[in-house]
Amino acid sequence: MEYKYTTTFQAPLISCEISEASLISKASLENLAPLVPDNIDYDENVDLMGVAFNAAVINQFNKNGDGMDTSTAIKYTDKFIHKPTNIEHDKQKIVGHIVSAGYSKFGSSELMGEEEVRAIKEPFNISLGAVLYKTINPNFTNLIKNSLDSESDKYQKVSASWEVGFNSYVLAVGSDKLSEARIISDPEEIAKLQGNLRSYGG
């Protein structure tokens, strides 16, 4: 399906090793642990690596000036499951797949249920669990491991990002947080102001 517009959400993949084959967010080891696939015997499946990470901040603008609200996040989060993970958005460089998706608190990464999220207007995270294929691209999995080593020049250099396509949008004016911004949905007013958007050179 073709979309008129695309944007990318990005979050640092700050991880630590919880077993020889599993990685999870360093800042919140216990909080994101339930997202790491636990129905896989990593000792038997030595070619797999389990990973958990925050994928995007909701209700806050990304570096492109784009943002996603709570209702949109809820609508699309489950659609991450079973999607492939790749390198640099190259669909020919698949290195794993998403196996779980959820939400976590911004800052602490404490997991939240969908009902709790529905009432939130402040920033929170979409959090994902994935399985990576070690043998498909050993250089990539080694890069992940090196990103955990504080003495490596690759330390904390890995980030997770995902591209979103959409055909329409509204404007949020006045704040970097959606909850504090004025929402403009009138097509004529959007047309007048869209030149100020980064995607239009503003």
Language-model segments: residues:
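Signature of dsDNA virion morphogenesis modules
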Residues: 1-202
